[in-house]
Regions:
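Sec-dependent N-terminal signal peptides
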Residues: 4-13
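Sec/Tat signal peptide C-region and signal peptidase I cleavage site
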Residues: 13-19
Length: 268
């Protein structure tokens, strides 16, 4: 597994003698790759054991209270673990690793919403997805539009965004709920998180894809960081897009299959 470290000094807020450093470990599109790669160019790389060792080392070095572990969607589907065990082992692995916040990816819906709801009931992490109305579906009450987590003495707000699944999921599943405009919803919730909840930082966990992340970022306010997925894009360094107020929105994404681990260091 390759470790990609990005220091977001540009997000420093009033750095001084009492400055805090938050570390965010992020994955996306792991697609049920619980084991290391068994063949090909990346044989032996990735897998839950390697991930656990890396995560534990970061928590030990930085202090668990200063570390967040997040996933930007599509943790399931892609190996026989999903097809044979109905997505159960992925939930067990994520619980063992101690994920804090997860957003939904389109492949989470592959077995239908009843099965997804069953799995999410067993997931310890907060699950966020803001741009769908799940009212009346099995996911109602299991998925939040946004959430707040305290780490490194700061309040971090999370918003989840998901691609239009009508393009990639069975129509009978996609028609169970309503798709909402990602930028419009993100702006509403980001303002709420900053002004009403007093968040020091607002992060979008996005399963829109890199190109759409850039488009949405340009239509946002009050969002500091987008941790992306869906397009399996490998970004070796941060990308920035100016928002509606001319402020930089940082975008990161971490390829696929758990071959890389993203590590963001944010100084406040």
């Amino acid at each position: 597994m390759k470790r990609i470290v990005i220091v977001l000094a540009a997000l420093a807020f009033a750095c001084g003698l009492d400055a805090q450093e938050l570390t965010i470990i992020h994955f996306n599109d792991t697609h049920s790759h619980v084991d290391p790669q068994r063949s090909g160019d990346y044989v032996g790389r990735g897998g839950a054991i390697e991930h656990a060792a890396f995560i534990d080392s970061v928590r030990f070095a930085s202090g668990k209270k200063n570390v967040l572990l997040v996933h930007a969607g599509d943790y399931g589907q892609g190996t026989s673990y999903f097809t044979e065990l109905q997505g159960n082992i992925e939930i067990d692995v994520m619980n063992s690793l101690g994920f804090d916040v997860v957003c939904l990816g389109n492949h989470e819906f592959d077995n239908g919403t009843v099965e997804l709801a069953r799995r999410l009931k067993n997931l310890d992490a907060e699950v966020v997805c803001a741009n769908y109305d799940f009212t009346g579906s099995p996911l109602e009450g299991l998925v939040k539009r946004c959430t707040v987590v305290k780490r490194a003495g700061k309040k971090i707000g999370f918003i989840g965004l998901l691609t239009d699944i009508r393009r990639v999921v069975d129509k009978n599943i996609a028609d169970e709920f309503k798709f909402l405009d990602p930028a419009e919803v993100a702006n509403e919730l980001a303002e709420y998180l900053k002004k009403e909840k007093g968040c020091d930082m607002v992060i979008c966990l996005s399963h829109l894809g890199y190109e759409e992340d850039k488009e949405v970022a340009a239509s946002m306010r009050n969002v500091d960081l987008i941790i992306g997925g869906h397009s399996h894009t490998l970004l070796h360094k941060k990308q920035t897009v100016k928002d509606l107020d001319g402020k930089d929105v940082v975008i990161v994404q971490n390829w696929k299959w758990g071959l890389n681990a993203g590590e963001l260091k944010i100084r406040f």
